[in-house]
Amino acid sequence: MDTAPTWFTGQLLLALPGIGDPRFEHSVIAMISHDEDGAMGIGIADPIEGMTVGAVLDQLGIEHEAPLDQPVYLGGPVEPSRGFVLHSRDWGGEGAVLVADRWMVSSSHDILRAIGEGRGPSRWLVALGYAGWSPGQLEGEMVRHGWHVTPGSDALLFDTPPARRWQAAFAEAGVDARLLTTKGGEA
């Protein structure tokens, strides 16, 4: 029997303990795209120490009224100087892409100007870099128990403090993350 592949666009990937790559320990990744050509996601649980949205806007010469002290997240190891804004669907400016009818992602300065001027989306987060997988790579990592997939909620994505996102995402999926282990028991 031939079964259709399962794609994870619009869902959250949660790193399982012992994933084998320290860059992804306790990662929560919002999946932007996943299909036969590979996958792309943005990490939403690892703030870059000392970097705020206001500081990024200052570096880009974009004026802003509010201090914008929200953290900038490490989106992943691929293209770490490339910025992304993951945001609610109530803003659809230049280059905004709808992700699985759930949220949107933008990477233009247009959205940063809108945020700086207070006319951007109602909910958003900014990340640098992304996580990328070649065709079949993510599926292989799933077989090796590297990731858990969950729908996640908008509240988890935008409202939960970053230090709690990994554990909270597992809790939303009905899993107590404290009980996860990399070691098997003996019967």
Swiss-Prot record:
The organism that produces this protein has a lineage beginning with:
Bacteria, Pseudomonadati, Pseudomonadota, Alphaproteobacteria, Sphingomonadales
Q: Which InterPro entries match?
A: AlgH-like (IPR003774)
One matching Pfam family: DUF179
Q: Which organism is it from?
A: Sphingopyxis alaskensis (strain DSM 13593 / LMG 18877 / RB2256) (Sphingomonas alaskensis)
User: What's the protein called, per UniProt?
Assistant: UPF0301 protein Sala_0165
Q: What family is reported? A: Belongs to the UPF0301 (AlgH) family.
Name a single GO cellular component.
cytosol
